[in-house]
Amino acid sequence: MPIFYESLSDNLRDWALRQPLFFVSSAPYRGRHINVSPKGLPDSSFAVLSPSKVAYVDSTGSGCETICHLRENGRATVMFCSFDATPRIMRLFCTGSVIEWNDPRYAGYVKRMGVKSLVGARAVIILDIFKVQISCGFGVPLLDLTVDPETNEPKPCFTNRPRLGKFAEYTINRGELPEYQMQWNSRSLDGLPGLHSAMRDKGEFIWWAHVTNWASYYHFQLDIIKTGMALMFLVMVVAQWVGYVLYQW
């Protein structure tokens, strides 16, 4: 079951900096492409500036999705996960901004982060945390060693953790799976409708879920229509006022 915090504690900060990589996801408001970028070198490019603010040095790459999305809507999520014996997933839900390499503030942020500016770095990404989510990570594979049959040399490999399957089996045997799904799978973090079977078990109407999804999907167009109607009303009021003034003359 997930646990939520408003900021990073010292032990979560230290754990994050020990991980070999992290992931950054972002998306435009209306575009089709949702971006996920793996980032290496967290110990030398990622920094925790305060319990509610983190930053990382962004290297030049073949795309610029995160920077573009942050400048459009300021939304990003950072995820760390453990590949060792102790499983964990940590997500940092953030709002962010971009400090480019030629910005006068860039050198100051790099110094504050306590990292060396990477060769080819193009920006520092500043992220303000508004929610921290911790979950079990039992579905993340374990990094292990095996023997290459051709060379007889050890090589890294991924092995599945048995805990997730055992948890599901235990929950099913106790008849607790529907209750678990009702609690954790019926809604998203933002309240969007989720698993229909879980919603039915909670006594919710699926047709209303479809209406909610439709309204969420088309809210941008609805906002444009409402704004257009408000502007039209304002123009009509101004036109009537101008006509009244001219009539008085």
UniProtKB/Swiss-Prot annotation:
Give the main localization category. Answer: membrane
TM ranges: 227-247
Example GO CC term: the record gives: membrane
Specify which residues bind substrate according to the UniProt entry for this protein. Answer: L21, F22, F23, V24, A215, S216, Y217
Q: Record's InterPro entries?
A: Split_barrel_FMN-bd
Q: How is it placed in the membrane, per its record?
A: Single-pass membrane protein
- Tell me what this protein is called: Pyridoxamine 5'-phosphate oxidase family protein ustO
